[in-house]
Amino acid sequence: MSERGIKWACEYCTYENWPSAIKCTMCRAQRPSGTIITEDPFKSGSSDVGRDWDPSSTEGGSSPLICPDSSARPRVKSSYSMENANKWSCHMCTYLNWPRAIRCTQCLSQRRTRSPTESPQSSGSGSRPVAFSVDPCEEYNDRNKLNTRTQHWTCSICTYENWAKAKKCVVCDHPRPNNIEAIEFAETEEASSIINEQDRARWRGSCSSGNSQRRSPPTMKRDSEVKMDFQRIELAGAVGSKEELEVDFKKLKQIKNRMKKTDWLFLNACVGVVEGDLAAIEAYKSSGGDIARQLTADEVRLLNRPSAFDVGYTLVHLAIRFQRQDMLAILLTEVSQQAAKCIPAMVCPELTEQIRREIAASLHQRKGDFACYFLTDLVTFTLPADIEDLPPTVQEKLFDEVLDRDVQKELEEESPIINWSLELATRLDSRLYALWNRTAGDCLLDSVLQATWGIYDKDSVLRKALHDSLHDCSHWFYTRWKDWESWYSQSFGLHFSLREEQWQEDWAFILSLASQPGASLEQTHIFVLAHILRRPIIVYGVKYYKSFRGETLGYTRFQGVYLPLLWEQSFCWKSPIALGYTRGHFSALVAMENDGYGNRGAGANLNTDDDVTITFLPLVDSERKLLHVHFLSAQELGNEEQQEKLLREWLDCCVTEGGVLVAMQKSSRRRNHPLVTQMVEKWLDRYRQIRPCTSLSDGEEDEDDEDE
């Protein structure tokens, strides 16, 4: 066969294309151009392409910039024919596999007894590769890279392996560091009996490409001290029958092929937490890994240690479970500003979808002139009282993941907006917690559903009901909105009048906001949502808009009480929900379950059982001024006494012993929706399982005792 007849191998899929092809027939990748061989330009000693290429024959003896591989270096007739004679071509993807492989390394297809592209001489020699002399280029193959590892140094920026002579990285021009030792994982022949040398070669390539934007760990440890103990993982997975191993072989191999360098570092850090190896955690942190990363099902299967690892665990979970106080202090410092959020709706997606279907099924449109949508179920979300039974470190972890700490701080500390009454927050167990939600324009709808059903408005079911209600009942809501805007402007001394066309334009803008997913909503939309819920909504919010410099820009106008005034009182519930507002963002304010109260308010008669949780929501601010009631008509407007009377008609109100006017929010776990209760239990079980172990081991001894 002449040199013109030699095909060129695609550097992406290894398919061998005809010399005339400029793109790969399989993956359409561009044909590789000439490879850079030396640092300085050189003149070829001979035009004979059949002569063996020798790195030492380059002018001045300069070292290669890019290590040539089997597909990029000049082809030699003898070695090319021997290479094809030793490997067998896959009938599915044409990948050239080593003779001892019984399955294709790329697609895992079974090897045929005689491949169509295999030469007659090689068809019967699959048991042992034919010995052949290695040319000077063969030392750069993946098979022989281990022997020349000390001749390279790894760039700490792009992870490219440069020759020892290079003073800076060939790819990114980063200066050569003082320490040239590189961290490599699973490169030795003894690391695993399952991964063959082609797997390791492809894995190393994926590490270089997948982590080119991340800093490799600049650790001073040697490879043997920080590399992943793959043999321990392999041996742990070898427990079981031969049939089970054969079934799991393909799955485990696929998982390993997808793993990148950062993934192995993360698994190494997880094992390091269990075994008390702080160096593994430092290596993962130095590589830029996410401390809040959670274990996936595939990673747990690869670790194969159920007594120690579980899906969803982070390094913090493991440190708490195995009582690694020194590691916990380091990890909590790292994640204090960027804690991974985990609300109940995230733990069980199947239950969350069922709840969304329940909400959609409970939405109905009332017949008649006021054709507004409404919910048929009364549901109030509260944090379970079982949280208090968890260890303090686990409680702190739970609150970091479910609460919005920034909102909580702004509403409590920067301004006394919630929990300002010690009587309500402590003695009456009515402390409010700000739940974390999405920060987009859907935060109002998310917070409303979180305060009731504990989930997001992911499918925009509530937004659609909001838009349809505004559109179908436009006349009713428009009249209320127009009268309220006129009165509010006059109350601030702004006496002006608008043409009807201007009012209509502003109203059309409000309607358009309701129909756009992600668009921010206004006070009118809260008023409509109170009618959809058929219950009052109390908003506790900051009073002023402020710039990033802290300058006051204007009034927010969100704080107050929103009553479903267009419904009959008998059609509505008197148990309100509470929302928090902070600089363009709404959050659900929920309480924690308590045992209920008998007669805590002056003049209040609460005939409740022990299962009912009563939360006392203040109807006054920290200065004891009554909260505004929004969207009142001209007949309903009056002095503070008249507004308080109106509040008592629409809410279950009482006055505490401290003289605070409050509204009672009632909820019951037994009477709550069963799907919500089940979702909360599954979410709480996640934290119950990370209790610190009583023993110094990983809990395996306890399991053995139980089995006995």
Swiss-Prot record:
- EC number per UniProt: 3.4.19.12
Signal sequence, start to end? none
Q: Which domain of life is it from?
A: Eukaryota
Q: List the disulfide bonds.
A: none
Q: Which GO MF terms does the UniProt record name?
A: cysteine-type deubiquitinase activity; K63-linked polyubiquitin modification-dependent protein binding; zinc ion binding
Cite the binding residues for Zn(2+) 1: 10, 13, 24, 27
Q: Which family does it belong to?
A: Belongs to the peptidase C64 family.
Tell me what this protein is called.
Ubiquitin thioesterase ZRANB1
